[in-house]
A protein has these predicted regions:
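Zn2+-dependent metallopeptidase catalytic domains
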Residues: 1-212
């Protein structure tokens, strides 16, 4: 997978929205999820845990995923063409599945718990809060459930994510399909000139009089 030209994987600056393509979306999320899996695999077997080789690496990896995902969500909301929607839905499905499994990873949970117990005397309040939230997240994700219950929980999470996504897409479709036509400019008094010009152009495209 050649990701060298993927705009979503360049984290030095603010997102370059004008350069992001639909092809970039799932490719970026898939790549970052695979990288996250590799990091988790290494951390599971670490004997000596430090903030730098454990917590920082996990936070950095999760932060990259969040930074790539945020523009995808935004573009899905404001563009919502067929290609963008497909890439968004594929990416959402992958992320939901991945983090559902991460949240139930007992080896990783035990490493977090061990690190906290071994280092809590030397941690500042912010570090303690971060770890407390992470440990609580594992518990809320069903890390202590029996195997069959863990799978049921993950399946329910994925189903809920799909339902939420479908609901959002239906709202966008309804919003995009709705329009109101005004025959005269009088009722639109106060609207900026450029907005009126756009409304007039839309009306003309739809073979309507006035403004849409």
């Amino acid at each position: 997978m050649d990701t060298s030209k993927n705009t979503l994987l360049k984290f030095a600056n603010l997102p370059a929205f004008e350069k992001i393509t639909s092809k970039d979306m799932y490719q970026a999320i898939s790549f970052l999820v695979q990288e996250n899996k590799k990091i988790v695999k290494k951390i599971e077997s670490l004997e000596k845990l430090t903030w730098k080789n454990f917590i920082y690496r996990m936070e950095e990896s999760d932060d990259k995923i969040a930074k790539a995902w945020a523009p995808i969500r935004h573009l899905n909301s404001v563009m919502n063409d067929v290609k963008t929607r497909n890439q968004y839905e594929k990416s959402l499905s992958l992320l939901t599945s991945h983090y559902g499994k991460i949240g139930q990873n007992k080896k990783l949970f035990n490493q977090y718990q061990r690190f906290y117990e071994e280092n809590k005397k030397n941690l500042n309040s912010s570090q303690k809060k971060l770890l407390a939230d992470v440990l609580q997240g594992f518990k809320l994700s069903g890390v202590h459930l029996a195997p069959k219950q863990r799978k049921l929980f993950r399946d329910s999470q994925e189903k809920l994510a799909n339902l939420e996504s479908n609901f959002e897409q239906n709202i966008l479709d309804s919003t995009n399909s709705w329009s109101k036509n005004y025959k005269t400019e009088k009722i639109l008094k106060g609207m900026p000139k450029n907005s009126l010009e756009i409304a007039s152009e839309v009306a003309a495209i739809r073979k309507q009089d006035g403004f849409t």
